[in-house]
Swiss-Prot record:
The keyword Signal applies. It comes from Rattus norvegicus. PROSITE patterns: SMALL_CYTOKINES_CC (PS00472). This is Eotaxin. The keyword Transmembrane helix does not apply. Glycans are attached at residue 94. One of its GO terms (molecular function) is receptor ligand activity. Residues 1-23 form the signal peptide. PANTHER family: C-C MOTIF CHEMOKINE 13, SMALL INDUCIBLE CYTOKINE A. Pfam families: IL8.
């Protein structure tokens, strides 16, 4: 009887730890960039972007999403990347008529 009680306790403890880990999926990056584009992407092709700054990723990057749904990694230190993110920020803030 004591053995089954101890096993039940261990099972419940393990389950509670598992649910706590799964409750924080935001701490795990969904993607990391390993290479970055060397070509400038025209603003007319860009739809959105996200910043990859997680410590688990080797490179800090901007991931642009194009109007065709393609994701492209770019170096956030490049001037064209900074200009493109500013353009997208302004575009998203401007209300459409």
């Amino acid at each position: 009887m004591q053995l089954s009680t101890a096993l039940l306790f261990l099972l419940l403890t393990a389950t509670s730890f598992t649910s706590q880990v799964l409750a924080h999926p935001g701490s795990i990056p969904t993607s990391c960039c390993f290479t970055m584009t060397s070509k400038k992407i025209p603003n007319t092709l860009l739809k959105s972007y996200k910043r990859i700054t997680n410590n688990r990723c080797t490179l800090k990057a901007i991931v642009f999403k194009t109007k065709l749904g393609k994701e492209i990694c770019a170096d956030p230190k490049k001037k064209w990347v900074q200009d493109a993110t500013k353009h997208l920020d302004q575009k998203l803030q401007t209300p459409k008529p």
